[in-house]
């Protein structure tokens, strides 16, 4: 056992309103070279629907094949778009 005092509820509230609460925002602001796509998955809705289908059907994958295929199609389309965008940019700038 440690001799650390138990954290006060005030400390926990401060933790979520202090600098730790904005850590991601600060990181994103300091990383302007990061593309928006690295923080946002356009296929998240399809992924969520797949997971909801699995939960609704007790894990029976055969019942959710349409949702899985929709996710695969979305992901493939997104990856192809990203590849094309990278192909059209130069190594030394925009």
Curated annotation (Swiss-Prot):
Domain of life (superkingdom): Eukaryota
Disordered: annotated span: 1-21
SUPFAM superfamilies: Cysteine alpha-hairpin motif
Subcellular location: Mitochondrion intermembrane space
Cysteine-cysteine disulfides: 43-74, 53-64
UniProt main location, coarse: mitochondrion
Motif (Cx9C motif 2): 64-74
Gene3D superfamilies given in the database record: CytochromE C oxidase copper chaperone (1.10.287.1130)
GO biological process terms held by the UniProt record: mitochondrial respiratory chain complex assembly
InterPro entries according to UniProt: COX23, Cys_alpha_HP_mot_SF
Motif (Cx9C motif 1): 43-53
Gene Ontology cellular-component annotations: mitochondrial intermembrane space; mitochondrion
Domain CHCH: start-end pairs: 40-82
Keywords in alphabetical order: Disulfide bond, Mitochondrion, Transit peptide
Biological role: Required for the assembly of cytochrome c oxidase.
Record-stated family: Belongs to the COX23 family.
Protein name: Cytochrome c oxidase-assembly factor COX23, mitochondrial
Chain's gene name: COX23
